[in-house]
Regions:
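Active-site bordering "gate/hinge" segments
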Residues: 1-299, 306-310, 315-318, 401, ...
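Dual-mode signal for accessory low-complexity, basic/Gly-rich regions
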Residues: 6, 118-119, 270-462
């Protein structure tokens, strides 16, 4: 009988090592009565600090390990999760998953489990969490600068170290680890009319530039007070990197081969087939994901155990890859696309240019500067059309200068449209483009300047 016990939120343990994960997986597989079994393991250590009204309000840490056992009975499957790691609990979860699998409808698209795969060598990663005092010191840089400027700061620091493993009854075992840190700050004016925001994202706490977060958020809060209303319409628009990431990652999310082949997406070709090899955006646009990028947050394998590889989605405006899952790849007689994440956008990189945001502004006769978007919702998948709102600093540009803060807009726009209207790009930087801004949402995006960006209506939201 194993001596492994449950990991609680308060257990003083680190994330699992490869050997520990392999031991758990082997014990879970040994006790499974299913025809085929897959074991997914997630081990996470998390630390966070929240601040509001210019003071730290919460600080916490937790550790947990979760094991999901998927049992396959013919073409039927079911999953059960547990964070109890003893033999009896793992066996009970496997048995329960098997019994449930017998009751669910068969899945005609079910693919057999993979045998052992060859994975790239695991990268050396710094897996550590900052202390509460270190996190509080970073928060203090924001709150003190806000207080000195008679502003109100709110923000969140999240640090996460994690290990993931996948094993199955055909002998496959995969393991990887990662670390992600993000710090965000929103600074408001006391009258509620001004709002500034900034974020710093990295793989270790040393990557976080709290001083820059403080300076940017405070400056935007000061300069965005008392915004004026301008007419909705199509404007030359400069999108800062976070705003670019908010929308450009949706392009890769839409690059599903099956939807394209079945005529349900922008990447469907008129008359049948898909747009592989066709030019769809400006020549300067190249989008890639590469799990071997040094700062990549992507693990080395997908949810079925396939090793991930570098994928060029769009190169010089031309569609190079669509996302084929294993079933659709087999049906179409092609290789599956080896990319992780639900949207295939983790560690997405857009190749940038050389024009800085100040230079873009200098070269703009009349336009709009956008910090970021939120409340982004799909409108039409066939054009990748989305709607959402600007927030935390939207400004009018006139004759090469930022002249006024303006009220927020609702936009109705497709990233495909504005990537065809590209005028300039700046250097690519790491940003967090997740709408919930949790650690692990890193993508690499440049600021861009586009023409005819569609703002459909005004918003009273700050």
């Amino acid at each position: 009988m194993s001596t492994h016990g449950p990991n609680t939120l308060f257990a003083p343990v680190n994330i699992l090592s490869r050997a520990e994960a392999q031991d758990i997986a082997q014990r879970a597989l040994k006790n499974s009565p299913a025809e085929e079994t897959r074991v997914s393991i997630s081990s996470t250590a998390r630390a966070d600090t929240r601040f509001a009204l210019n003071q730290v309000t919460t600080s916490g840490e937790n550790r947990d390990t979760n094991v999901t056992i998927t049992a396959f009975v013919g073409n039927r499957s079911a999953s059960v999760s547990t964070n109890r790691l003893d033999d009896a609990s793992l066996a009970a979860a496997a048995k329960q998953a098997t019994e449930i699998a017998k009751l669910v409808p068969p899945n005609p698209e079910r693919m057999p489990e993979l045998s052992q795969q060859t994975y790239p060598a695991a990268r050396d990663r710094v897996i550590s969490l900052p202390t509460p005092a270190e996190r509080a010191a970073a928060a203090k840089l924001v709150t003190e600068l806000a207080r000195a400027n008679e502003l109100i700061a709110t923000g969140f620091i999240e640090c996460r170290a994690s290990a993931s493993a996948l094993a199955n009854s055909k002998g496959l075992f995969a393991f990887d680890s990662s670390a992600n840190v993000t710090m965000t700050a929103t600074v408001r004016s006391p009258d509620g009319t001004g709002s500034g925001w900034a974020c710093s994202d990295g793989t270790t706490f040393a990557d976080i530039d709290a001083k820059q977060v403080a300076a940017t958020a405070v400056e935007k809060a000061k300069t965005s007070r008392s915004p004026v209303a301008i007419e909705p319409g199509r404007y030359v628009t400069i999108l800062e990197p976070t705003a670019v990431g908010n929308l450009v990652q949706l392009v890769v999310g839409a690059m599903q081969a099956r939807a394209a082949d079945e005529g349900r997406s922008f990447f469907s070709k008129q008359g049948g087939g898909n747009k592989l090899g066709m030019k769809v955006v400006d020549d300067r646009v190249t989008l890639i994901t590469d799990p071997e990028d040094a700062p990549s947050t992507t693990g080395g394998f997908d949810g079925s155990g396939l090793p991930l590889e570098k994928v060029t989605w769009i190169e010089n405006g031309v569609v190079k890859t669509l996302n084929y899952d294993r079933f659709w790849a087999q049906k179409q007689n092609v290789q599956p696309t080896r990319v992780g994440g639900g949207f295939g956008a983790r560690s997405l990189r857009m190749v940038g240019g050389t024009t800085s945001v100040p230079d873009m502004i200098k070269e703009t006769e009349r336009g709009v500067l956008v910090t970021r978007f939120w409340y982004i919702r799909a409108v039409d998948p066939r054009t990748i059309l989305y709607t959402g709102l600007t927030r935390d600093g939207t400004f009018l540009i006139e004759n090469g200068k930022v002249t006024h803060p303006i009220k927020n807009f609702r936009f109705n726009e497709s990233p495909i449209f504005f990537l065809n209207n590209l005028q300039a790009m700046g250097p690519t930087v790491r940003i967090n483009a997740s709408e919930n801004l949790g650690a692990g949402g890193a993508v690499y995006m440049p600021p861009i300047k586009v023409r005819d960006f569609t703002f459909s209506s005004l918003s009273d939201a700050v």
